Amino acid sequence: MALKVVLGVSGGIAAYKACELVRALVKRGDEVRVVMTRNAQEFVTPLTFQALTQQPVGVATFDAGYEAQIGHIELARWADVVLLAPATANTIAKMAQGMADDLLTTVLLATRAPVVVAPAMNTQMYLHPRVQANLETLRQTERHLVIEPDAGELACGEVGAGRLPDPPVILAELDRAFSPQRLKGKRVLLSAGPTREAIDAARFLSNPSSGRMGYALAAAARQLGAEVTLVSGPTALATPYGVTRVDVVSAAQMHREVMARAASVDVAMMVAAVADWRPAHPSDKKVPKSQMAATLELERNPDILADLGERYGHGRQGDGDERRPLVVGFAAESHDVIERARSKCARKGAHAIVANRIGGPTSTFGAESATVHLLAGEDEPQTFSGTKTEVARALWEALAGHLQR
């Protein structure tokens, strides 16, 4: 859904990053109109934003030319969302106190659209009690969402919190402001990625899972309001914003981390491509090729989904007060996808299972898109196709109904 975005730019060194943010918004189809504070113009010229948006830039409350084109009240009504990035300590203080002494703060008071605030400033300023109190005031204000700043080296040379997050993070939080919070108050546990089973210090058994589907599901659950923990095997993917990530390598490590957390969640969704077997006698040193045996003795890994199903899954009778998460598995099959997935769901004791095809041109391993089939109870299979981001959102929308039963 294309959004009408009013981007407020206040006067900090991070103002130059707003140019990249505008490009990202326009690229995905959003319509953007920029409003700048007087101090912001010391860092970036209005002409830059006008060139990027092909729209006039608001800089002063009583600019007759701008008011003739679109007045500040009309701009406030036009917006689907007001995004303040970067938000300086000064502008945050004005917002918290309800001040309206320039065009930007006037629009912020007049709009009934969601307001997304992305603070960016020196670490010591960000940590100051008054700034934190003002941010808390905004968090408690209806329709306001505060994006936490990144930590790292700042323009002033200090290291700490205060950096403006990258555009993908801001865009994800922008979308979250428009997402129905169907998972609000829910705790979700996901596994993702491959596992690696060591043969020796240089070799291991693994599979080509990229982890993209699991990470997309983590991001989508967070967007829908859930508190998300992601237990991840080795991947090259960035952690979705707001998601707690636990890194593991082997299937045994993943089993331990998942089982330790499952009792406290509402959904346990096992997306990881976990190795079924591991070398029985791994070496902690690299074994010379000349000394390696022609055969490799293997032993079974613990079955994470089966153990979840046995403890919490379908058909298990628990105490009335006992938390029992919805157990959802994934089945990667090369043939007879629906039938084999349905059998796996029953065998493992899962409440639901998501089936996808691997092998051949439609394999989902490492791909950007996917076609999956959701099997839940006696319901007819539901099929979802698209990018993994789109499929993840559709799966959660479908599963949200099962959480209400």
Which residues does each PLM region occupy?
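A cross-family phosphate/adenosyl-ligand binding-site feature
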Residues: 1-405
